[in-house]
UniProtKB/Swiss-Prot annotation:
Residues 90-150 form the S4 RNA-binding domain. The lineage of its organism: Eukaryota, Viridiplantae, Streptophyta, Embryophyta, Bryophyta. Keywords: Chloroplast, Plastid, Ribonucleoprotein, Ribosomal protein, RNA-binding, rRNA-binding. One of the primary rRNA binding proteins, it binds directly to 16S rRNA where it nucleates assembly of the body of the 30S subunit. SUPFAM superfamilies: Alpha-L RNA-binding motif. Its main location: plastid. GO terms for cellular component: chloroplast; small ribosomal subunit. Belongs to the universal ribosomal protein uS4 family. This is Small ribosomal subunit protein uS4c. Part of the 30S ribosomal subunit. Contacts protein S5. The interaction surface between S4 and S5 is involved in control of translational fidelity. Coiled coil: none annotated.
Length: 202
């Protein structure tokens, strides 16, 4: 399944706020999952499916990519759900978004694809690059790159940067300080339902 490129507002009306996809927050349409349903019982499969879709659309990844992340998380020690979220949060495009360098993850992905971003002094043009503690995220030293990032930072500096990241506004340098904890996830999600959804596939 390819990456979604359709109307973003339509998605968040159905699934709720997905800050990685869009910063718009339209009024939610009535949803059988968001309100009590006396006449219709919602299947557990559908509930798990919608939680899975939240991850897909928020992080802007394909079905195959998400399944691969679940498989990696299952093989690691610890809570599969938390490790899955850590893997997604440590993607370079998401780190750029959480640092405030881009208003959305698709926007961050463009910055990476267009070679505006350096990791530890080297250009990285792979949005799925997995960042690790002590990685430095900087901007390419060109006027166009600097202008794009400065515009984003000035507009989105009101948003709080999570505890596992540090941004130095003077040097325009981001640092992955540590592996994030569950409380730092910027999305309302039940990751256990996602793991259950893939229980027969991963």
């Amino acid at each position: 399944m390819s990456r979604y490129r359709g109307p973003r507002v339509k998605i968040i009306r159905r699934l709720g706020a997905l800050p990685g996809l869009t910063n718009k927050t339209p009024q939610l349409k009535s949803s059988p999952i968001n309100q009590s349903t006396s006449n219709k019982k919602i299947s557990q499969y559908r509930i798990r499916l919608e939680e899975k879709q939240k991850l897909r659309f928020h992080y802007g990844i394909t079905e195959r990519q998400l399944l691969n992340y679940v498989r990696i998380a299952r093989k690691a020690k610890g809570s599969t759900g938390e490790i899955l979220l850590q893997l997604l949060e440590m993607r370079l495009d998401n780190v750029i978004f959480r640092l405030g360098m881009s208003p959305t993850i698709p926007g961050a992905r463009q910055l990476v694809n267009h070679r505006h971003i350096l990791v530890n002094g080297h250009i990285v043009d792979i949005p799925s690059y997995r960042c690790k503690p002590q990685d430095f995220i900087t901007i390419k030293n060109q006027r166009k790159s600097q202008a794009i990032i400065n515009k984003n930072m000035n507009f989105y500096r009101k948003y709080k940067i999570p505890n596992h990241l540090i941004y130095n506004s003077l040097d325009k340098k981001g640092l992955v300080n540590q592996i994030l904890d569950r409380e730092s996830i910027g999305l309302k999600i039940n990751e256990l339902l996602v793991v259950e959804y893939y229980s027969r596939q991963a």
